[in-house]
Design a protein with these regions (language model features):
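Surface-exposed binding patches on compact interaction domains or structured appendages
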Residues: 567, 594-597, 620-677, 770-809
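Structured lumen-facing ectodomains of secretory-pathway proteins
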Residues: 156, 197, 313-499
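Subtilisin-like serine protease catalytic core
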Residues: 131-252, 266-269, 295, 317-324, ...
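Autoinhibitory propeptides
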Residues: 10, 22-28, 51-142, 156-164, ...
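Catalytic-core environment of secreted peptidases
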Residues: 183-192, 200, 378, 383, ...
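C-terminal subdomain of the subtilisin-like protease fold in secreted/lumenal serine endopeptidases
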Residues: 64, 272, 434-461, 497-503, ...
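Beta-sheet-dominated interaction scaffolds and their linkers
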Residues: 481-488, 572, 581-623, 662-664, ...
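Hydrolase catalytic cores
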Residues: 210-214, 218, 244-245, 391, ...
């Protein structure tokens, strides 16, 4: 009966203050800390009042973190059911699970001895000129690195005149002058953090990003020396190192909030954070706190994510706030390859997977290309092609890597049977193909262009030998300077234009903890984000002020370089590159701006056909600007009735048309003009095409920097985008014990005793939903209650091993009788139940059932 009185007290109190909102987990890939919650209080509710409320509510809880700027706390309760009731506690505004963010995934390559050409990323962005001509270094700017810590002893972080870096809180002679370890080495996201204050990095990621922001390895004489000199974007910034990850594993979102608050209180001008997860929605505590900090004058950049192989709608949530910067990755100009030299030309190659070791053939062996009567290269699929050229002993046979008739395994076997000592495969399309090959035969794949050069050289002198390099060298690769394949596609769940901007993130050489080798190359949007952070620092120093984060984002976006993919004649979608590749030099020199810095046209139902922009002349003199529309690639994001966005959206030459109220506009110095744009949707009839482009204002003055803003939209009614993966039979019921799934597709009819056998629900979502519900109906289809399934994020198409990523939920037979858990859960009596999955359509009001995609599962019998 004690319970009843608790309920009464909650209900009485709840009538005074409206109940809070319990948020579902919207990260398709993240885990949660069991029974841990982040709660936000209503404005004006003090921590003491809130704790009184929690206590009267009889929730037994422990405080994990108390926050100050974010009005709330994180707590642990005894059971999941206690947590779900939190939303009804007076004074509570929002309740979230504590999500565990993965340590950002990067591709790591060991840095090889290279030459100075490889410091190419600053040429792409104007940062080299800012360093050399304008002497900008980010001096005086404070940058918070919320990450795995920083190896502060690294010589690349040494203060001027010192040979070694150091960390001292508020220390004048250390570049790492702020920071804290919130977690300890053994923390993995799920266990209890053991803060120790020392932000030394044992994982490596934070040291790498810190080096990109402002490491200086130009003149290092101590060991280990960098494989080549390099410098970060802003080599005199002061760092705060806020360590939120242990040596491995993830980090709880409540730790991240604490780190963000401390970074702000330490006076950081900019924080840079990149956290995994493909939420695509901004209603999470991190994004909310980020917005608050930005409104107080701090800037924040977050990684767009490395989910480029998962189709559209996959941007990570850290950069999704209205004022935060979501950063896409561009490939560096150069990549490192072993190479052959033939006729004096260096040709990068990639070795076959089956051979998988360096090729150490003598440098005296000639080539024998397999040619047809016209001199064209044959595919090497027919053994007769080999017998036609005579003995291949001590020779390198050359064939075309066309996969129509055979793969590299078949081609390699033929070469081996014919007695060849090695094989060179000429790629038949862009890039250097990867080869499966055969064990025992050295097989190397080269680009098509190099293959053609090789044949031309061979035609002149058949005796030329191939030599094989021992080292790697830098080569301009096919996608050099263009958006990285791995970089995630937007838009966000609300169809806003994200990512915002791009920066070099593919193949970036930077610092690494000394204990782990000191330097390495890494790739990821994690590498692009700190580049933007460093760019902020240079911009702030150039303007001798602390402009609002919004102003800097706008300046960087307005002046970025709009880019094309490799060999493409058209511009890459703004849903992939944002406003383009950052050009900090142009941002500093520009004498114009366009507000807002992105145009969200939304879908056909909510289409913004008329949009006003403000073009400002920030220079001293009158300037005439010409406005034009520069279309970018359209993306076909769905095919047929498939629930899943396409892994690789198909590029379509389709775009909106734009007319301007004025195509030419003369603006006096310091003044602005309002220009009205009229948009028309593209004519295409493909399914939910995502189209985009750029509105560009070009000044008449020769050499003056043009400014632009990206626009993005989706044609069609976004409410009709399918959400649940019914194509592949999900959601489906499975058989579980209390902790694990035992049979993922048990025979019909399902009977569960809730002692040994529990029903489990396996689901998979191909699109985000603003709200998901799981209802339980009895045998007469009457609503019994709701299951707090708590998951509404989109899953990636597959994990790293190619397996589908699934949501699995083991049901203990309990339901909440109201949707927002204002009463304790009940266990359903024995009987037959139908479980209904309901996902709210994007951009709908959320009326049930009209605005939901609904899937009724086969009945479940509870014995
Ligand atoms: C809680 O649920 C009740 C009944 O389902 C509903 O009337 C009320 O509006 C909900 N409150 C909130 C804050 O969602
Ligand atoms: C900076 O952002 C990158 C990418 O998001 C992230 O991996 C890294 O942890 C962040 N480091 C800083 C500077 O906070
Ligand atoms: C989707 O399926 C419906 C019904 O089967 C069919 O009428 C429609 O043409 C399909 N749409 C596409 C784009 O394939
Ligand atoms: C549930 O099944 C898993 C896998 O078969 C097993 O490891 C675990 O011990 C079982 N748990 C219980 C509570 O029986």
């Amino acid at each position: 009966m004690k319970i009843t009185s608790t309920i009464l007290s909650i209900l009485a109190a709840a009538s005074l203050v409206s109940a809070g909102k319990f948020h579902q987990v919207k990260h398709g890939k993240t885990n949660i800390v069991p029974n841990a919650y982040i709660i936000e209080y209503h404005e004006g509710v003090s921590h003491a009042d809130a704790h009184n409320g929690l206590k009267t509510h009889a929730v037994d809880y422990k405080v994990r973190n108390e926050y100050k700027i974010f009005n709330g706390a994180s707590i642990t309760v005894n059971s999941e059911h206690d947590g779900h009731a939190l939303a009804s506690v007076p004074g509570v505004k929002n309740v979230w699970h504590v999500s565990i963010y993965d340590m950002p995934k990067t591709q790591k390559v060991t840095a090889k001895k290279t030459d100075p050409l490889a410091i190419s990323d600053h040429h792409m962005t104007g940062v080299d000129v800012l360093h050399e001509k304008y002497k900008l270094t980010g001096k005086g700017v404070k940058v918070g690195v919320i990450d795995t810590g920083i190896d502060y002893n690294h010589p690349a972080f040494a203060a001027k005149g010192a040979t070694k870096g150091c960390f001292a809180r508020n220390g004048k002679n250390c570049r790492i002058a702020h920071g804290w370890d919130f977690v300890g080495d053994a923390y993995n996201g799920g266990n209890t953090p053991k803060p120790d204050g020392d932000p030394m990095d044992c994982a490596g990621h934070g040291s790498h990003v810190a080096g990109i922001i402002g490491g200086n390895a130009l003149d290092i004489k101590v060991n280990p020396k960098p494989p080549q000199p390099f410098v970060g974007v802003a080599p005199e910034v002061t760092y705060g190192a806020y360590r939120i990850f242990g040596c491995t594993g993830g980090s709880g979102e409540d730790v991240i909030l604490a780190a963000m608050e401390l970074a702000f209180n330490d006076g950081m001008d900019i924080i840079n954070m990149s956290l995994g997860g493909g939420s695509a929605y901004k209603d999470n505590p991190t994004a909310a706190l980020a917005e608050t900090l930005i409104s107080k004058g701090m800037a924040l950049s977050g990684a767009a994510g490395n989910d480029g192989a998962n189709g559209v709608w996959m941007v990570s949530d850290t950069g999704l706030g209205d004022h935060a910067t979501s950063v896409a990755s561009f490939d560096n100009m150069y990549d490192y390859y072993n190479y052959i030299t033939y006729g004096g030309v260096k040709m990068p190659f990639s070795v076959s997977e089956a051979y998988a070791k360096p090729i150490t053939l003598p440098n005296t062996l000639p080539i024998v290309p397999l040619l047809d009567a016209k001199g064209s290269l044959l595919d090497g699929c027919d053994p007769a092609q080999y017998t036609a050229v005579g003995s291949l002993k001590n020779k390198i046979v050359v064939a075309l890597g066309d996969v129509t008739n055979c793969k590299s395994g078949g081609r390699g076997a033929n070469a081996q049977n014919a007695g060849a000592t090695g094989m060179i495969v000429v790629s038949d399309d862009a890039g250097i193909d990867s080869l499966g090959g055969v064990a025992g035969l050295p097989m190397a794949s080269i680009s098509n262009a190099d293959g053609m050069t090789m044949l031309a050289t061979y035609a002149k002198n058949k005796k030329n030998a191939v030599s094989w390099s021992k080292d790697q060298g830098p080569f301009i690769i096919d996608n050099s300077g263009a958006p990285s394949d791995f970089s995630s596609f937007g838009l966000d769940g609300d169809l806003r234009s994200k990512p915002d901007i791009g920066a070099p993130g593919g193949n970036i050489l930077s610092t690494y903890p000394l204990a782990l080798g000191g330097y390495t190359l890494m790739s990821g949007t994690s590498m692009a984000t700190p580049y933007i952070t460093g760019s902020h620092a240079l911009y702030m120093q150039a303007k001798h002020a602390k402009p609002h984060g919004d102003v800097i984002r706008q300046a960087l976006k307005n002046t970025a370089t709009i880019s094309k993919n490799y060999k493409s004649k058209t511009f890459t979608s703004a849903a992939k590159q944002g406003a383009g590749l950052v050009n900090v030099l142009n941002a500093v020199l520009a004498e114009a701006s366009i507000t807002p810095d992105h145009i969200d046209l939304l879908d056909s139902v909510n289409f913004h056909k008329t949009v006003q922009i403000t073009l400002k002349n920030t220079g001293k003199h009158t300037e005439t600007f010409t406005l034009k529309n520069v279309p970018a690639d359209g993306l076909i994001s769905y095919q047929g009735n498939n629930t899943w966005p396409l892994a690789n959206p198909v590029i379509e030459a389709t775009s909106a048309s734009v007319t301007f109220s004025q195509e030419k506009v003369k603006i006096p110095g310091g003044k602005s003009a309002k220009i009205t744009l009229h948009f028309k949707e593209p004519k295409t009839n493909t399914l939910f095409p995502m189209y985009s482009g750029f509105v560009v204002a070009t000044p008449k003055t020769k050499g003056a920097v043009a400014v632009h803003v990206p626009y993005t939209g989706v044609k069609g009614d976004i409410r009709k985008v399918p959400i649940m993966d019914t194509d592949h039979g999900f959601p489906q019921a499975a058989l579980a014990n209390a902790t694990s799934i035992i049979d993922d597709a048990p025979a019909n009819p399902y009977t569960y005793d809730l002692v040994k056998n529990f029903p489990a629900f396996i689901s998979r979502f191909g699109s985000h939903t603003p709200n998901a519900e799981v209802r339980v109906l009895d045998s007469k289809d009457k609503l019994v209650g709701y299951i707090s399934f708590g998951e509404s994020g989109r899953q990636p198409l597959a994990d790293e091993n190619g397996n589908p990523v699934l949501n699995e939920y083991i049901w203990n037979g309990q339901v909440q009788t109201t949707q927002n858990a204002t009463a304790p859960a009940i266990t359903v009596p024995a009987g037959t139940y139908t479980v209904v999955f309901a996902q709210q359509h994007k951009f709908s009001k959320g009326e049930y059932p009209k605005d939901f995609e609904i899937f009724k599962m086969k009945p479940v019998t509870i014995a």
